């Protein structure tokens, strides 16, 4: 993918890594991706040609969500190590196929939950692990609502620079509509899944990490929400999901929109562009900890 994350990762590549190929189904984005490498990378519209190259050791998959599993499995089968953006996949079956492919072909696969790599996330984890807020019993995540398609537009011919069939890939074919891309694919269940699968993959990933719950899961899930009644986008607009965990007992809540806790340093908000629209509060039996955002930016409440 040659969108924001794709060429950002290419541009920030380590000095001991050569970006030899970039790929996107949109020729305009593809040109931008090539430019981000200083014109050194070879452009491709079809990722399968990238996987055929013997000089490619690893790939970064920053495509729409519905492509993640298929491209990860293909990369493993061709011996390429993988960094795949969150969310890792769209279904449990896809996730199992990805794990199986990585194990069978002895490939390293990393999922892009960038928030875990931030210094602030490390400090927040240590703060909780050292018992500074006591035993954590509840984590409440908040996020603004998913957009609704209140002004639908008719289907049309795809733009000349876009390979629409290849963009759809594993999805059922349908006519092109500008409400499908680029970033707005996230508001469709089959290709994005709404805010909970987009930003939730960041905020709740940190929660599972901090609570040492990566290799377990909830014993019950309760949800309520409001779904759209018009337009193409079908992800829930408002929603609240409550996950109950056992051994230890704790509750994880995802609320959109939820009760936002304003960031305490207003000057820093303006200076660094902190996005207050989504974050999490960790409630312990002695105190609480607020961790803002959860992906490229992670900030903890000063204590």
Predicted segments, located by residue:
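N-terminal Rossmann-like NAD(P) cofactor-binding module of classical short-chain dehydrogenase/reductase
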Residues: 58-60
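Rossmann-like dinucleotide-binding domain that binds NAD(P)(H)
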Residues: 165-249, 260
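Conserved SAM-binding strand-loop segment of SAM-dependent methyltransferases
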Residues: 41-46
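N-terminal Rossmann-like dinucleotide-binding module
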Residues: 1-38, 115-118, 128, 207
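Basic phosphate/pyrophosphate-binding loop/patch that engages nucleotide-derived ligands
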Residues: 100-107, 123-137, 147, 155-159
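Beta-strand-loop-alpha-helix segment that lines the small-molecule cofactor/substrate pocket
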Residues: 64-65, 69-117, 131
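NAD(P)-dinucleotide binding in Rossmann-like oxidoreductases
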Residues: 231, 244-303
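Core domains of carbohydrate- and sulfate-ester-processing enzymes
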Residues: 140-184
